[in-house]
Amino acid sequence: MWSRFMINVKVSAAVYPTEDPEKVTKAISVLFTGIELQKEPLDAAESEKRVSPAFRLTGEGGLDLLFTLHGLIRREAIIDSIRNKVFSKGLSSEGLLVRFLLNKQAAFVGIPSVPAEEEPLGSIEVVIRTDSPEEMEKLFEWLLPLTEEGVPVVEVEMDYVERG
């Protein structure tokens, strides 16, 4: 029996003056069903960019926020692609946090896509925190499992995770 643990998921995206805030909201909501987004002011680093965003949309929750993303990654058969990009760039050295970006335009039509780098009008940023490296490993086994020819070798459940 697994001990229960918490997963914290934070999703945010800068909204630029040329963007429709409703479309950015939809792009996030398509991948993260049930997320409640708040409008937040910019931090100092963002407001110093050449083209400055107007504000940032941010939402937080638990594992439940990842269920839609979990299904879409499988529907699009991109587990390997996403896992390779996330592991190679986004996992913290202590293994408690993973950070990755998702393309806003692809998200708008329900396709999770990790851009090669930060996009000119920003990306959707996803930050996932766990209490231990073992918990992060279990999360990866569930969200981005090892595959054979693109099909998960084993699908694990996450029923031992506290619901935020």
Curated annotation (Swiss-Prot):
InterPro entries: PAB1135-like, Ribosomal_uL5_dom_sf. Gene3D superfamilies: 3.30.1440.10. Pfam families: RNA_binding. Belongs to the UPF0201 family. This is UPF0201 protein MA_4659. It comes from Methanosarcina acetivorans (strain ATCC 35395 / DSM 2834 / JCM 12185 / C2A).
